[in-house]
């Protein structure tokens, strides 16, 4: 009977980990807190989670400021080509960090920010660069669409909504939001509707440019605490936009014609000079961009003045699109291969198939943005049939499949072939 009572006392005195439930005899170490215990295995698991989160932040920070080389190295993992634009962005973000660090130490010289304008043809990676940048920096980052903005008082979003989104990205921490970065996409869509100022009100064009001037330069923006419409009785959060870095991007369709025709004099008659059309690609023409071209396009001079750095992006050729399909960490080919892996099937693309897909995207003039729709069309029937098929081990895509001259090649496992022979 004494043995039973001793074992009962032992079980009462045994300590257990509050997280995994293991006893002190099953682990090497049990650490005691005020009311809880944690074992060495759970501590190690917590450390692994923290290490993984630190890795996913992407940019290694040295003395609090990531170098341009460190930023561009991470961008290179996701974005193919566009080295000039990546250099501009990495230097701008690096200087943004430095400016914030400088302000906390000294007030003798005020460092002004240099907002950026990204100009490039559609599908060349402007928006994707900004999205990738958002993943790798540790300051609040938000993206806004200029096409949804209108002047205050009209149906649509006010420009203050951009600051509200940044505030939400900072978990309503005003101090962190004031150190953030804003990317405004489709900024070419808010250009003035005519070269000359109009008598009628342009609430979604020039009016939005006028409204953006102050927040881009620096002002105290009044933002509703939890979003929604402004009410007179509502208390607002005051956000200083002086240190917020603004990056704007747009395709500027038709701007190449303005650049090519710059300085031309119109003449008629038999003695008129006939100039051959500019055969350069859009990206090459954009390299000759001047502020006066943007003014002629429809941006007001004050708005252009708030964007001192202009970075032009290049057209993507066949080789660049082939690399985009297969090389980046989240390349389209890798994404579809992962989808097929879930069906225990290997997906393979011939090099000529990737070239044919790239050529189709160039013919459609959609750039990298059009690659997914082409891939979906190629693989639609296969993705429909595959879950119902047994024994498919590999699917091979050739250039004939892309050109709709053949079906994808299905390679079956030996077991599936044996079953077919037996049933026959």
Swiss-Prot record:
Lineage of the organism: Bacteria, Pseudomonadati, Pseudomonadota, Alphaproteobacteria, Hyphomicrobiales
GO molecular function: ATP binding; ATP hydrolysis activity; ATP-dependent protein folding chaperone; protein dimerization activity; unfolded protein binding; zinc ion binding
Cysteine disulfide links: none
One Pfam family cited in the UniProt record for this chain: zf-C4_ClpX
PANTHER family linked: ATP-DEPENDENT CLP PROTEASE ATP-BINDING SUBUNIT CLPX-LIKE, MITOCHONDRIAL, ATP-DEPENDENT CLP PROTEASE ATP-BINDING SUBUNIT CLPX-LIKE, MITOCHONDRIAL-RELATED
Subunit annotation: Component of the ClpX-ClpP complex. Forms a hexameric ring that, in the presence of ATP, binds to fourteen ClpP subunits assembled into a disk-like structure with a central cavity, resembling the structure of eukaryotic proteasomes.
Keyword tags: ATP-binding, Chaperone, Metal-binding, Nucleotide-binding, Zinc
Name of the featured protein: ATP-dependent Clp protease ATP-binding subunit ClpX
Annotated function: ATP-dependent specificity component of the Clp protease. It directs the protease to specific substrates. Can perform chaperone functions in the absence of ClpP.
């Amino acid at each position: 009977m004494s043995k039973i009572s001793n074992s009962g006392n032992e079980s009462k005195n045994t300590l257990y980990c509050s997280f995994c439930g293991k006893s002190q005899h099953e682990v090497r170490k049990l650490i005691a807190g005020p009311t809880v215990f944690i074992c060495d295995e759970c501590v190690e698991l917590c450390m692994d989670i923290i290490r993984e989160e630190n890795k996913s932040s992407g940019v290694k920070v040295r003395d609090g400021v990531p170098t341009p080389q460190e930023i561009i190295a991470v961008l290179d993992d996701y974005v193919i080509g566009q080295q000039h634009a990546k250099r501009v962005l990495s230097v701008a973000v690096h200087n943004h960090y430095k400016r914030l660090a400088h302000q906390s130490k000294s007030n003798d010289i005020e460092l002004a920010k240099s907002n950026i304008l990204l100009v490039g043809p559609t599908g060349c990676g402007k928006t994707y660069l900004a999205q990738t940048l958002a993943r790798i920096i540790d300051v609040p980052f938000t993206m806004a669409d200029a096409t949804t903005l209108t002047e205050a008082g009209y149906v649509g979003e006010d420009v203050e909504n951009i600051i509200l989104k940044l505030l939400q990205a900072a978990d309503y921490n005003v101090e962190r939001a004031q150190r953030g970065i804003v990317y405004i996409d489709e900024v070419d869509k808010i250009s003035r509707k005519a070269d000359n100022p109009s008598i009628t009100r342009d609430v979604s064009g020039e009016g939005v440019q006028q409204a953006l001037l102050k927040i881009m330069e620096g002002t105290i923006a009044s933002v509703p605490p939890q979003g929604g419409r402004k009410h007179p009785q509502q208390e607002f959060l005051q956000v200083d936009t002086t240190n917020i870095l603004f990056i704007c991007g747009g395709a500027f369709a038709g701007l190449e014609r303005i650049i090519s025709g710059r300085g031309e004099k119109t003449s008629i008659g038999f003695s008129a000079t006939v100039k051959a059309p500019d055969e350069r690609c859009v990206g090459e023409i954009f390299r000759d961009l001047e502020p006066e071209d943007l003014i002629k396009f429809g941006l007001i001079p004050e708005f252009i003045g708030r964007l001192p750095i202009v970075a032009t992006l290049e057209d993507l050729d066949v080789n660049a699109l082939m690399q985009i399909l297969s090389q980046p960490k989240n390349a389209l080919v890798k994404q579809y291969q992962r989808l097929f892996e879930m069906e225990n099937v290997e997906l393979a693309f011939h090099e000529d198939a990737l070239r044919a897909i790239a050529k189709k995207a160039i013919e459609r003039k959609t750039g990298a943005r059009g690659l997914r729709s082409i891939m979906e069309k190629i693989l639609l029937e296969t993705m429909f049939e595959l879950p119902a098929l047994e024994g498919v081990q590999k699917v091979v895509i050739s250039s004939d499949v892309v050109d709709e001259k053949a079906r994808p090649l299905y390679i079956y496992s030996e077991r599936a072939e044996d079953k077919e022979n037996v049933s026959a």
